[in-house]
Amino acid sequence: SEYIHIGGDEAGKASWPTCKLCQARMKKEGLKDVNELQSYLIHRIEVFLNAHGRKLLGWDEILEGGLAPNATVMSWRGTEGGMKAVDSGHMAIMSPGEFCYFDSYQDAPDSQPEAIGGYLPLAKVYSFNPVPDTLSADKVQLVYGVQANLFTEYIPTPEHAEMMIYPRILALAEVAWSDPSVKNYDDFHARALKEVEALKAEGYHPFDLKNEIGNRPGADQPIQHLAVGKKVTYGPDAAYYPGYSAGGDSALVDGVIGGWTYGDKRWQGFIDKKRMDVTIDMEKETEIHSVGADFMQVCGPEVFMPSEVIISVSNDGKEFTELKRMEHKVVKDDKVTFTNFGWEGNAKARYIRYQASSGEFGGFLFTDEIVEIGRASCR
């Protein structure tokens, strides 16, 4: 092969600042930080490969500390790494996890064999644009192409691999060779349905596209409830995790329901000491007949249901009256599950407090919306 992929991703550098050998090498080579130490190693590998008539290809982490002179970057943490490579005159291959990791579920998780997580339906693959419109023509030529990835920890057979690949690979192929202006998903979907049947006739095992369930119910349209747009405050030691903010302080009252994966920027994640402690200011005393929130569980990445949920109300924001306390036995399994923890009844209050804590397994808590409605029903 002309190219040798050397990886270079997810190098744990936590111990490098205190490692005597690392520090000695940094001093000898005049390197100012551990990122430059990794870059030094990548440069050495490239010199070796080039001397043997090969070219270096690596994940976008090889940008850290300075890119090797002739390296090609495979961008998996979004497209930003690829754009940085192109801007510096290097070739790039676009392979962002959001669009190109085919080990994610492609339909409702409870209808699919166990996967690593995530949700990447055919339509989302097709929506990928690997070349931003703002990129100049000379830089476009440096985008070498796109690549799908299928990691097989949860894929035990070739038949299962075929199901994960087809028909999503057909969508990525059209992404690669089509101008975005001529793409039409409805037209592609009709052709993909026919291609799936043709693949079956040839003995392949593609995903059953004609029976696709689609996104999680409620996730495609905003909902209305009493708390939409109200002010939300987070208790001490109970802030959301910055990497899973879902848009910030208003995320849990924005009327937007999360989909099948916590990575869709709609689920807010909590891993602080007290996990989740949220208070909603309804601005005035309000009749409330139900309060509820959905949580998800995906054991592989340590996302678990809460072990306890407390819903309480107040008129002064200081003294709260408990409406309901729910204890839940968290059980590990291989499924992606969704559970609503809610209260129904009659109450009048200005402030609504929703607390959720983790059990013995720890991990993240994820919820998408705290729904308050003024009639006796719960979502």
Summary of predicted features, one role per range:
Residues 258-324, 335-377:
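Aromatic, loop-rich ligand-recognition surfaces of beta-strand-rich domains
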Residues 55-61, 66-71, 76-222:
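Flexible, acidic glycine-rich loops studded with aromatic residues
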Residues 329-335:
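Short proline/glycine- and polar residue-rich coil/turn motifs
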Residues 6, 49, 73, 169, ...:
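Hydrophobic, well-ordered secondary-structure elements that form the walls
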Residues 1-69, 76-84:
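Active-site neighborhood of glycoside hydrolase catalytic domains
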Residues 20-29, 73, 108-111, 308, ...:
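Short secondary-structure boundary/capping segments
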Residues 16-18, 84-85, 104-105, 303-305, ...:
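Short, solvent-exposed loop/turn and secondary-structure capping segments
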